[in-house]
Regions:
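Alpha-helical transmembrane segments of multi-pass inner-membrane proteins
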Residues: 1-23, 27-35, 41-109, 229-230
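A conserved mid-to-late transmembrane alpha helix and its immediate loop/hinge
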Residues: 40-47, 83-84, 182, 193-229, ...
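Long extracytoplasmic/lumenal interhelical loops at the membrane interface
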Residues: 29, 33-37, 136-141, 146-209
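Membrane-interface junctions at the ends of membrane-embedded or membrane-associated helices
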Residues: 64-72, 109-115, 233-235, 282-302
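Hydrophobic alpha-helical transmembrane segments
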Residues: 77-78, 96-100, 117-120, 245-249
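Transmembrane alpha-helices of multi-pass inner-membrane enzymes
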Residues: 247-302
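Hydrophobic transmembrane alpha-helices and their immediate junctions
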Residues: 64, 70-73, 101-108, 211-256
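A membrane-periplasm/extracellular boundary helix in multi-pass inner-membrane enzymes
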Residues: 4, 10-13, 87-90, 107-151, ...
């Protein structure tokens, strides 16, 4: 649905509410730029839309190898194609990091030689395509995605680097940050505020909670990923279930790689991320129930 809405925006134009966002609220400044129009579907902005589409690519792409049924596989392939299209028209360069990060995580968690070889081959081909060739440069969306692999040539990236250096000087005296909700926006009017806009979710956490809060945040999520990975590798015996849950966890891992480059921890992106953790923790119980059902079926057949 999100990709279809993006297609409608691209070919039929924006409706009144979307035009209000663009031309009254100032969204045009970041969505109608020199490289083209960044479409945002029914999401809050193009970055949110692009990363959500990237989540669909990785989740359905990895799950495709573990599902049964021809029609279900066809449906998953159609979803992946739609998600690739949606990610492309969003013009969100950070989104490309998500499927790459998810694929890298899958290589680690798969414990399968064929999967490892396939994953490494796909990563190598992606790297060669975007870094070592100019294929598709006549397409504005491919050209924009390719620029993510050449950050030194990107003026906006260099501006972000300079801003982070200035932020670091201010944050030395703010070990607990400026306060929750004060990293961005005009919702609050505090006495003191970060003069430079945070360019990613992790930078927002750093500005709001300081180095202490950022370390705590990363530690908690590091434990979650390690714990869930351990469950998938050693606690779940059903290969199909393990593969499907691995798709969820790898998508979450790729999301945090994208969150380093862009502020994408927004609704509804946060829902699949913490759903992934919940499903992994529930995995052993689901695995046990599936095993019991299988044993019951075998007894009934006898």
């Amino acid at each position: 649905m999100a990709a279809a809405k993006g297609y409608w925006q691209k070919n039929c134009g924006f409706n009144e509410r979307e035009q209000y966002f663009l031309y009254v609220l100032g969204g045009a400044r970041t969505h109608i730029i020199w490289s083209g129009i960044r479409y945002f579907s029914f999401f809050s902005d193009a970055a949110n839309f692009g990363v959500h589409m990237a989540m669909g690519i990785s989740l359905f792409g990895i799950s495709l190898f573990y599902i049964k049924g021809v029609w279900l596989k066809i449906y998953f392939i159609l979803v992946i194609i739609a998600a690739i299209y949606g990610m492309g028209i969003s013009g969100t360069r950070a989104a490309i990091a998500l499927p790459i990060g998810a694929l890298g995580s899958f290589i680690i968690l798969s414990r399968n030689r064929k999967a490892c070889i396939t994953g490494i081959s796909v990563l190598a081909l992606l790297f060669l395509f975007f870094v070592c060739t100019n294929i598709g440069d006549d397409n504005q969306y491919i050209r924009k995605m390719r620029s993510a692999f050449h950050p030194s040539q990107d003026a906006s990236y260099q501006l972000r680097v300079d801003n982070r250096k200035k932020m670091r000087e201010l944050m030395i005296h703010k070990p607990f940050g400026y306060g929750i909700g004060l990293s961005k926006g005009d919702r609050f009017y505090p006495k003191e505020r970060m003069p430079y806009p945070p360019d990613s979710w992790l930078v927002s956490v750093w500005v709001e909670t300081g180095i202490i809060g950022l370390v705590l945040y990363l530690a908690v999520h590091g434990v979650l990923f390690a714990w869930c990975g351990w469950i998938l590798m050693f606690k779940i015996m059903n290969k199909r279930l393990r593969g499907l849950l691995t798709a969820w966890l790898c998508t979450a891992a790729g999301f945090y790689l994208a969150a380093y480059a862009n502020d994408v921890m927004q609704y509804p992106n946060s829902i699949p991320i913490y759903t992934a953790f919940a499903l992994c923790f529930a995995g052993p119980y689901i695995d046990k129930r599936m095993q019991q059902n299988k044993e019951t079926e075998l007894k009934n057949e006898q």
